[in-house]
C-alpha cells in the first residue's frame, strides 16, 4: 500500500488511481476527509476537523521534463502544508532487506516506488527505453533516500513516518525498521497502519488533527476531491494502460480527453411495471499519446484487441464514477519525445488549463 491507497481508504472514495507499478501518480491530488468531534476525557476528546490530504508524485531525481514537472508538484504541495507524511511500505522493506542496505521502499510520492525496477524482462526492441526509465528513477536506493530526506530536513512543520502494510510484517521486525528510519530523521510521530484491515487509520487522523491550526472549512462537507470529472476520467483510462500493458509503455503514455458529452436533462417518463430503468448515456472520446510506433502497436494490439481491453476496463470504472452508461472511444497518437516537451507536459496539467481558461474569460 502506498499513499494513493491510503488516501482512498481515508476518504472512502476512489480519489487516486492505484497500480503496482512505480510512478503511477503524476499530479497533485486532493482528498478531503471529515473527522467527527469526539467527546470524552481530555486525552480522548478531539474537535471536528476537515483534513485536506495532498497526494503527490513520487520523490525521485528527475530525468525528463515530465519528471521535473512531477517534482514541481511535490514542491508546490510542500509550500502549503501543515503536516507531512512520509510513507514506507514495511512489507517491501522486509523483502528487500537482504538485497540492499538502504532505507527500503519509502514514499512521499508514487505507489510502491521501486527505483530502477520494472516487471518482467524488456525485449531487445524496448531495452533502450527501459534503460531510460531506470535512469529517470534514480541510480540506487541510497541516493534516492538521501534526496528524499534532504527535502524533509528543510521542512519547518511536523513530519510523520507512516509504516504501511504492517499486517504483512512480523511484529519483531517493525521496531528495528523504525529505529533505522529514525536515524534518518527525527519524526514527530511514527504510525504503523494497514488500510486493508483499517488498522491505525483512526489514530493517524487523530494525530494529524492535533497538529492542525484552527481555521475555516476549505470545501463543502460532501466534496471529497478538487479534481474535475474530465481529469478523473483520463486517470481511469491511464490506470487501465498501467494495468494492461508492460515494460516502458505505461510510462510513455498520456491520456487527453477530446470530447465529453454529458447526457441532456430528461423529463422522467413512466415505465412499464417491472421494466429496468435505462440510465442516460455519456459520450467520451480520448486520445492516448505515446512516443514511438512500437508503443502504439502494443497499445492497439492484434486486431485492436489491446485497445478494446483497455477501453472495456476503463468504461466500467467510468460508469461507476459517473453513474451513467458510457460510450468510450479511444485512439492512439504518436507524439515523439512528449515527456521532454515542456509545452506538452504543461498542457496535461488541468490546473494550468483552468487558469488559462479563466484568463481568457472562458468556463469549462
Name what the model sees in each region.
Residues 55, 164, 194:
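Active-site glycine-centered loops adjacent to acidic/histidine catalytic or metal-binding residues
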Residues 1-81, 88:
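Conserved G1/Walker A P-loop phosphate-binding module
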